[in-house]
């Protein structure tokens, strides 16, 4: 099964125009490893609200560190879960390093993470759910940032930052913190025993922008009941960003079911 099999199922959805305030739009910019390409290791996106608030979603490994010239002003950093390909254990040394198939991720961000380093450099708030905020607050402090910039938003309510509403929604995925991020003796013990530290459940997000656009960011997940009851029927997002990875996340057919039957956005 290839990702191509998803496209016929959702192509019609993607052609439907979004109904938002015509005087203002949300700008969406992918920050992939290769300019002009969409590669399988790419995660990061910047969402810019009409009022100028800029949100970085899952910096991962393709944002070339805190000095990446594509970042610009960042007000909020979202991290769906603690795995290295989303939090950012290492990253490209520069944009376009390596290739789509073999990205150069030789620059280490450990033990702080790419996301934390970017938040410290830009002064952004890191907005997460579950048990992640306390861990990230400590990481911010260790990296020379303000621990108060780690903001909690658990399932059930929204935080409003810079005029943009942000909430977390359930995702069916593991969320252990690897020993590499923990560091010191405890980190070594975790690596030696092959286990990870507890961070609570993984999350997705619903982000509501000042022009009324609601966006569902699935994070890594499988099919969940909440995609219908919470995301689709309560938040009613017009745009969805759906992670597809088959064994590790929803497969192409499963993702098509989530989009067409549960969330029902107007664009994907």
Show which residues each predicted segment covers:
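Pre-active-site segment of Zn-dependent metallo-hydrolases
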Residues: 33-116, 144, 175-197, 221-235
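Bacterial N-terminal signal peptides
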Residues: 8-17
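Sec/Tat signal peptide C-region and signal peptidase I cleavage site
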Residues: 18-22
